[in-house]
């Protein structure tokens, strides 16, 4: 489609990045591997802003290549990794996957589309990302609106959009009546 102009303030993107990083418990000891593009909010806000506002380090890759990602995590001892589900599938299925030590990983973000529970479990088990989260958002919301918690059960991380981030108000509207739904309605 056509590009859209979206007005984002410095406060919006800084605060959103900070809250994303806090949700993943980033500290100055964290190193995030970013194989996602920086021209998109996923890379620049959820990635760069999240890690620098929480004092950590970004390991930036020129483009996505599963072998380069695995080698970078291994060499740089990254503690976090970002991607969309298909990127994680490509990494897990790479023929050289078992040659890399990924035990430094603990968290990250899987976003961009629905994450099947089986994939979330494989990433947690085979890539050691026990605290991986999912984020839902829009460019217009700077971009994160909701995020799962690092200690949410895997079923919650894979089947929901998580909880609203600080400063975000969420309402669920009945599409037929356009009325706000009471808490607990499904």
State the predicted function of each range.
Residues 70, 75-83, 92-156, 169:
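Gly/Ser/Thr-rich phosphate-binding loop
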Residues 171-186:
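Conserved beta-loop-beta connector loops within the AMP-binding
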Residues 14-31, 39-80, 94:
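Conserved AMP-binding/adenylation subdomain of ANL enzymes
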Residues 158-164, 180:
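Short Gly/Pro-enriched turn/cap motifs at secondary-structure boundaries
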Residues 5-7, 34, 56-63, 133:
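Short beta-strand->loop structural element characteristic of the AMP-binding/adenylate-forming
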Residues 65, 86-88, 115:
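Alpha-helix capping/helix-boundary segments
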Residues 1-15:
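Conserved AMP-binding A3 loop
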Residues 1, 55, 112, 137, ...:
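Conserved G/P- and acidic residue-centered "switch" motifs that form tight phosphate/ATP-binding loops
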